[in-house]
């Protein structure tokens, strides 16, 4: 049993290493392995925009395998999916030097859910539609978006859609204090 267990650990590491470099965060200074998920992120935003602008679709379900989820997790900065390996031929990914594990990033039936809430009508102060708010669930657990994103209030997991479009863009800009809801705009 001991030798078989060691073999299983070695094979698990080999599969994780392959996925890490091909679909995960990979090595420092590159993003090709996960920017391939950008069209999926763009579709999340497009679906929200379509609904907010009068579309009748109330939910969008997308189904995919780990080969899609791993890059999407790295792109979103989900827990355990962001630590890159050094850009080196000698300092490579190992379990000892990196938290990334395929079984954690994409367990069986891994899922990402965005809930969107928006008040109908227009903000009387701006004359524009109220800003949609978004929260994310990762494997059924409500979590914050990546650290570059500013929630509507300290400790909240709700974000303005405009903030997410900025902070999840490739340059990770944030609206800063404008991402917060003010006391007189809590219904926005």
Where are these regions (language model features)?
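Non-catalytic terminal regions with compositionally biased, polar/charged low complexity
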Residues: 1-188
């Amino acid at each position: 049993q001991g030798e078989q267990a060691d073999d299983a650990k070695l094979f698990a590491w080999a599969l994780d290493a392959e996925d890490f470099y091909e679909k995960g965060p990979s090595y420092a200074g590159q993003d090709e392995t996960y920017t391939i998920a950008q069209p999926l992120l763009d579709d999340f935003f497009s679906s929200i925009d379509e609904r907010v602008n009068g579309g009748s679709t109330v939910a969008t379900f997308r189904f995919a395998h780990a080969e899609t989820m791993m890059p999407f997790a790295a792109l979103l900065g989900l827990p355990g999916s962001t630590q890159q390996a050094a850009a080196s031929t000698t300092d490579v990914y190992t379990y000892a030097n990196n938290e990334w594990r395929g079984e954690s990033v994409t367990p069986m039936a891994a899922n990402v859910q965005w809930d969107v809430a928006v008040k109908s009508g227009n903000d009387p102060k701006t004359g524009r539609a109220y800003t949609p708010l978004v929260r994310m669930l990762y494997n059924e657990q409500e979590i914050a978006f990546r650290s570059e994103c500013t929630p509507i209030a300290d400790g909240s997991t709700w974000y303005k859609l405009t903030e997410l479009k900025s902070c999840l863009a490739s340059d990770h800009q944030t609206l800063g204090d404008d991402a917060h809801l003010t006391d007189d705009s809590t219904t926005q």
